[in-house]
């Protein structure tokens, strides 16, 4: 279950549907990803086809990422079956 966000625009999109703080062309994919994140109870629940689920390293150690489009990713921390600090970023 989603517990917290880092990205204010993504948080607004999740709660209100406003696209002001996200790339509008990513809206459909973001809805799909957020729905899966919110329902997940294990990290394997997030390893759906095309997700590109991977554990980050270096300064983002202990965070996971799933692919949105191109270089855009949803990153988050997974702990005890919950999702924290959800971010929407182009980190490459």
Feature annotation, model-predicted:
Residues 41-64:
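A short, surface-exposed loop/turn module that caps and links secondary-structure elements
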Residues 32-35, 54:
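N-terminal, well-ordered alpha-helical segments
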Residues 64-92:
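Enriched for short, Lys/Arg-rich terminal
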Residues 3, 27-30, 46-49, 67-69:
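Generic structural signal for well-ordered secondary structure
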Residues 1-33:
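Arg/Lys-rich, positively charged N-terminal/basic patches that mediate binding to nucleic acids
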Residues 6, 49-52, 87:
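A secondary-structure boundary/capping signal
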């Amino acid at each position: 279950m989603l517990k917290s966000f880092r990205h204010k625009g993504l948080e607004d999109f999740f709660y209100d549907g406003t696209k002001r703080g996200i790339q509008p062309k990513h809206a459909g994919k973001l809805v799909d990803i957020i729905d899966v994140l919110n329902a997940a109870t294990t990290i394997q629940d997030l390893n759906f086809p095309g997700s590109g689920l991977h554990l980050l390293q270096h300064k983002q150690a202990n965070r996971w990422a799933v692919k949105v489009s191109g270089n855009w990713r949803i990153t988050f921390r997974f702990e005890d079956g919950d999702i924290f600090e959800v971010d929407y970023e182009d980190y490459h």
